[in-house]
Every structure is written in structure tokens, then in C-alpha cells.
């Protein structure tokens, strides 16, 4: 039997506000445990929450960016459940009246096609604290610094059909919230966490299968691995005559498996009711207009502009617009060198390889956009060849200065004098007289292979400095003359 996967994602984005959603406590990461938890965060009697207006602005910003309906009036509700790191015994969230309604986001798949994923809603809520299980001699510690930190929970429609599509969607959300400046997207620190709802059904069936939810997956790689494992688990279970039960599961990256945590709760299990301490939030049209005017160029818009303005492919434009920092770096390189396609090749090629190898982000690049653009200029004006350019790039990455300074100090300038190249080729051909005779006696197919040998010998003799185009042209004339 053929199976179809159905996936819906819930992404929790921690909003980049300076204070918590209902108190003035700081939200900075890494503070000593329980030093950023106020009486309001702890739910002490007599305290009242005050809504952070900046969190509302950020949520509206996101809603406008996904072309969603913004509720003119949204209501906070109490979600009641017990957990050791939830000090109030309830979480202040939104249920029936979320701030952001239906919207959508386009994702680019590996084959370059674009798929639209529906977004059901996005709502504001407060984060819980954090349970710590290490260094407590068999007990657990509770850090409430995170309690009350503002979250935007983004709920997708079940439009995703594979683990790779899920990763593409999370990457698109990650890029969007960073472009908007509403979340730093640091998954290692928990700023962006993902719950994956996974089910399978026979291909062609319209009814959904029973879903399992994988909680708090915090890296792109783990999202793909967790979903693929869960798909396989469910298919094997059904084909062996078993039934998938609705439950919450946890992904263990060390064992590359998901394991059951608890039965999956429904909304009525949480006994939602309107929060009596918070008035409904009214969104005026003037406020929407103000926030809309502050929207930056969004990833999809930038990708489309890169394609139309620079003639880049969908894939290249998607990679280069994946983050605002990457897009700005690329455009600066293109501006300096005047050749967007060469700029794209170097940014996506040598530079990306260097950053991946060193574990660096684009904003930490040891090669500035100005220096990379300057080096590409020297390729364009034939000062250096592409091969020499790689040596120059490595030197720039090592902090040896600009391309011009490195070319000058290392004597890497390309030889373009035809007379000098001809003299060098004469020496190469004289030293390989036997191969020259074989070449002239061979058919076209064999000549093609042998020609590469002569080019290699010529470049070796010139220490890579001879202009490759001139070498090819002059060598062909001499061999066939």
C-alpha cells in the first residue's frame, strides 16, 4: 500500500522584546537562574498583568507579513494545566480570539518549485519556566527566568507532505521572523521551537489519520530526522496490524527515535476561559496602517527582486535571500564588482564553504563584502585567473588584506602578454615533442583528451599566472599549425 504523510507544525517564536509580556522583568538569555522572575511572573496574590504593547506590535507585524486577517479585537484566555515550571497553574494564551487569523507563506522546495502553506493562526502567549534535571542529585531544579517571556505561536494548516517540506517551511518562518526583527531565531537557545504533528493515510484517502505530536524540536536537522522516524514508525505499526494512538512524543537525537511522553490533550482538557485580569485588545485601523508602513522588504519579495533584477535562478535567489544578513552581503558584493552572477557564485561557493567549515554566520565572515567584490573585479579585468583567485580568497580569509594588496605582495598578477605566453608555450611543446607528434596523428576524440595535458603543462610552467583563455587559443594554433 502507498502512504501519504500529513504534517502540521506549531512554531513557538520568542519575541525580541526587552521585557516580558505581562511584567517589566528582563528577557535576556543566560542570566543566573531565578534572577529574572518578578512577583507577576510567579503569580503571587495581589499582582496584576500589564500587556506589553511591543509584543502586540510584533504579532501584528508578522500577521501583515503573511497576508493574514488581523482581529480587530482579540482576547487572552487562561490555559489550565499543572506542571512544575508553570508557577501560576495556568498559562495566559489566546484560544477563540487570536490576534492573527488565516494567512499563508510560500516555500521554495529543493527542485525550485514554490508551494503555498496555509497558516491557521498565530497567537500571543507567555512561556513557561524551565525544568533542569542535571546536577541536582536525582532531583529536578526549576528556573523561572523564562516564565512570562512573550511567545508567538504560529500554527500551520496540515498542508505539508514530507519532512523536507517541513524543514523548508520552518526555514521560511525562521527567515521571516528575523527579517521582521521580531525574533532572533536562535534555535540552540530555544528562541524558535517546533512541535510537529504527524499522521499517515492511504494515498488517495481524504480523511486524516491519527496524529502524534513531537514536542519541542529545536534544529532543522532534528526536525527532518524526527518526522522521518515518526512516519516510518506509524507505517510499520499500521502494516503490522496495530493502531496509532493520539499522543505526545519526544525526539531523542542520541538514539534517533521518538518515544511516548503522554496522551495528547484536547482543547477542552485545558478548560480555557477568558482571562479576568486582561481587557480585550482592540486593534485600530490606524495602528495597522502604521505597522504596515514599517514592514521591510520580505524574503519572498527579495527573492523575486533578485530574480528579476539580477537574473538569478529561483534556487540561487532563495539561498541568497534566506537571511537579511546574507542578502545584504550579496548585494554589497554585487555593487562593488558590478556582476551579480559572479557575486552569487562566490558567495554561495567559496564563501559559504568557508563559513560552514568554520561554523560562522555571514555577519562573522572574515572576508568583507567589499574585499570579495574587489577580488571579483580583478577576475573580470583579467588581473588574476579563477584559479589564482582561490589563492587570493584564502589569503583574504587569513586576514592578509585586500585582493589588490595580496596580488601585489605575492606577485600573483596574471600574465596577459601574448609574446611571453607564446615563448612559454614553445618551451612546453619542445619539452613534450613526442606528445605533440601523437596529438597531430590522433583523431578529434583523442585530441580533446590530450589537449588538456598541454594546458596543464602550460599552466604549471607559468605557475598558474598565464591567462587561461589566451593559453587555450595560442596553444590550439601552435598544435594545429
Curated annotation (Swiss-Prot):
UniProt-listed Enzyme Commission number(s): 6.3.5.-
Catalytic activity: L-glutamyl-tRNA(Gln) + L-glutamine + ATP + H2O = L-glutaminyl-tRNA(Gln) + L-glutamate + ADP + phosphate + H(+); L-aspartyl-tRNA(Asn) + L-glutamine + ATP + H2O = L-asparaginyl-tRNA(Asn) + L-glutamate + ADP + phosphate + 2 H(+)
UniProt entry keywords in alphabetical sequence: ATP-binding, Ligase, Nucleotide-binding, Protein biosynthesis
Any one GO molecular function term: glutaminyl-tRNA synthase (glutamine-hydrolyzing) activity
Ligase among keywords: yes
UniProt entry tagged with the keyword Nucleotide-binding: yes
Any Gene Ontology biological process: glutaminyl-tRNAGln biosynthesis via transamidation
Stated family: Belongs to the GatB/GatE family. GatB subfamily.
Assembly and binders: Heterotrimer of A, B and C subunits.
Function: Allows the formation of correctly charged Asn-tRNA(Asn) or Gln-tRNA(Gln) through the transamidation of misacylated Asp-tRNA(Asn) or Glu-tRNA(Gln) in organisms which lack either or both of asparaginyl-tRNA or glutaminyl-tRNA synthetases. The reaction takes place in the presence of glutamine and ATP through an activated phospho-Asp-tRNA(Asn) or phospho-Glu-tRNA(Gln).
Name of protein: Aspartyl/glutamyl-tRNA(Asn/Gln) amidotransferase subunit B
Organism: Ectopseudomonas mendocina (strain ymp) (Pseudomonas mendocina)
Gene for this chain: gatB
